[in-house]
């Protein structure tokens, strides 16, 4: 007999190409520690940034099927590139369960945080090419000047669990130099891998530039949505945090333990395609 699980105790699903979305999972866990989380990442196809958005969109749709199978009550697309690829599906509520991305909350926070209206976005190539951040920021602040920069090397470093040190600092300096040359006062960490190295980034950009972590803004939006729908988990105690990966679960856990010590209870492999690339 299938065990009945109250709607409030159903898990929240989080999706990313790799370990980056753990920054969003951590933000949700900090704000809603009683919630059960299922983190699913597509490390078999990592990184998403250089891939065509149509391909990323297809990957995302398959993961949504997985989250439905896992009886999730809500899904967070903890990946900016996947959010850009599937934005029309998210806006149209095209799935059996609510799903929301990280771009809109991050864009709204950046528009509010900036004093001068000069906003930088560090992201993947796919996110930059989509134009989703400039478009969304200007919905909240039409006069905003937005400059973007793709930082693929930082995505790779964070996925490896290398988030500090002299070489990382040099790479951050090189990546962000074009943005800082535009005299921005706000920088959106437009890839969920980047908050893992927020301390180095803040040190490079200086105290006059405010960092915006879309994951934290998304966690607030998730809490509000669950509250309005009567789906907040009342507890007791901390929720379970399980991970699934299309890659090597042991490798995932090794890196996850460095990026979020104690944050993931267990990891397992999932095979979602008949033949993985």
From Swiss-Prot:
Its EC number is 5.1.1.3. It comes from Symbiobacterium thermophilum (strain DSM 24528 / JCM 14929 / IAM 14863 / T). Belongs to the aspartate/glutamate racemases family. The active site is at residues 79, 191. The keyword Cell wall biogenesis/degradation applies. It holds the Pfam family Asp_Glu_race. Provides the (R)-glutamate required for cell wall biosynthesis. This is Glutamate racemase. It catalyses: L-glutamate = D-glutamate. Substrate binds at residues 16-17, 48-49, 80-81, 192-193. One of its GO terms (biological process) is regulation of cell shape. The lineage of its organism: Bacteria, Bacillati, Bacillota, Clostridia, Eubacteriales.
């Amino acid at each position: 007999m299938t065990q009945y699980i109250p709607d409030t105790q159903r898990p929240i699903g989080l999706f990313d190409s790799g370990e980056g979305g753990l920054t969003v999972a951590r933000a949700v866990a900090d704000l809603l520690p009683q919630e059960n989380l299922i983190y699913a990442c597509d490390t078999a196809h990592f990184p998403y940034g250089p891939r065509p958005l149509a391909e990323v969109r297809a990957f995302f749709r398959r993961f949504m099927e997985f989250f439905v199978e896992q009886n999730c009550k809500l899904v967070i697309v903890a990946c900016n590139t996947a959010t850009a690829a599937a934005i029309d599906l998210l806006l149209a509520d095209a799935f059996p369960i609510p799903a929301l991305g990280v771009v809109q909350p991050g864009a709204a926070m950046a528009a509010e945080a900036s004093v001068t209206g000069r906003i930088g976005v560090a992201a993947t190539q796919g996110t930059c090419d989509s134009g989703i951040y400039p478009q969304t920021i200007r919905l909240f602040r039409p006069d905003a000047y937005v400059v973007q920069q793709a930082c693929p090397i930082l995505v790779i470093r964070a996925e490896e669990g290398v988030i500090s040190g002299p070489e990382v600092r040099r790479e951050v300096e090189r990546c962000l130099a074009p943005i800082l040359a535009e005299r921005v006062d706000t920088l959106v960490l437009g890839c969920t891998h980047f908050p893992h190295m927020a301390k180095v980034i803040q040190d490079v950009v200086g105290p006059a530039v405010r960092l915006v972590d879309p994951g934290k803004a998304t966690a607030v939006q998730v809490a509000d949505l669950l509250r309005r729908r009567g789906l907040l988990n009342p507890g007791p105690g901390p929720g379970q945090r399980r991970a699934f990966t299309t890659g090597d679960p042991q490798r995932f856990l090794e890196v996850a333990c460095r990026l979020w010590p104690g944050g993931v209870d267990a990891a397992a492999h999932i095979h979602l395609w008949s033949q993985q690339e």
